[in-house]
Amino acid sequence: MDTELLKTFLEVSRTRHFGRAAESLYLTQSAVSFRIRQLENQLGANLFTRHRNNIRLTPAGERLVPYAEMLLNTWRLAKKEVIHSLQHTELSIGATASLWEAYLTPWLQQLYEQQEELRLEARIALRNSLVKQLHERQLDLLITTEPPKMDELACLLLGHFSLRLYSSFSLDLPKEDDTPNEHKNASEVPYIKLEWGADFHQQENRLLDSEQAPILTTTSAHLTRQLLETTGGCAFLPEHWQKEYPQLVIHPDIPPIVRPLYAVWLQNSDQQALIRQLLKTPMNNATQSVTRE
């Protein structure tokens, strides 16, 4: 069966409109209608009821939807595996947005400076999603602060990095000659919650000792940094950013939070040799706040 027929069927079922489906697929409306007729002929069943502009799935069409989605996903994975086998240097690396923005992008720059022929895929997602992809062999290498506890996974501690509480203004305790509101305590300013892992949140809550709800929860370190001045808030960001962004002010009364950084991959991965080779390039060359063990 032609996968393009299934793709067209799913788009029509989503839009409930042949014209809009044609626009999404960069086809003519007649081409979309022809593909649907082809699929209906192959299956021997009508997939849509058509009453003027009212297009609905028939019971047969409803039953086909999950199978069409599954077949297309399987086909995409099959193509990826075939391409993967032909390009031995291709490697997919996954991490959360905050880790990519703060630590991993400079590391990638180093890798490409050393090996121009590298073929990498940098994947950004939540940790739980990346762990699932790793387990299902859809991801080769996971960089995380919390390694999953699975027997089939290999784990390497890359080092540690420090996070500090920043704001765009001084959060020192007030002095006698200070004007009112010139300084604020960390618990008195809006807080932006940046996702650095479940263990981090326990340390975060203990240090801040504040019951106020965050004004924003995000996975992006750069978004957090850009909003500090706008919101007058504070957030935990990489310690080495003090040099890169001198407008950021560290809260001196809040100690740094030190987090581990791990590399995780499948023990029987066919990419083990390449993974170990890449991990020989230390991340502390790119960000001094990461130290090798």
UniProtKB/Swiss-Prot annotation:
It comes from the Bacteria. One of its GO terms (molecular function) is DNA binding. Belongs to the LysR transcriptional regulatory family. Residues 1-58 form the HTH lysR-type domain. The lineage of its organism: Bacteria, Pseudomonadati, Pseudomonadota, Gammaproteobacteria, Enterobacterales. This is HTH-type transcriptional regulator HdfR. Disulfide bonds: none annotated. Pfam families: HTH_1, LysR_substrate. SUPFAM superfamilies: Periplasmic binding protein-like II, Winged helix' DNA-binding domain. HAMAP family: HTH_type_HdfR (MF_01233). CDD domains: PBP2_LTTR_substrate (cd05466). Keywords: DNA-binding, Repressor, Transcription, Transcription regulation. Residues 18-37 bind DNA. The keyword Transmembrane helix does not apply. Signal peptide: none annotated. Negatively regulates the transcription of the flagellar master operon flhDC by binding to the upstream region of the operon. The keyword tRNA processing does not apply. The gene is hdfR. One of its GO terms (biological process) is negative regulation of DNA-templated transcription. InterPro entries: LTTR, LysR_subst-bd, Tscrpt_reg_HTH_HdfR, Tscrpt_reg_HTH_LysR, WH-like_DNA-bd_sf, WH_DNA-bd_sf. It comes from Yersinia pestis.
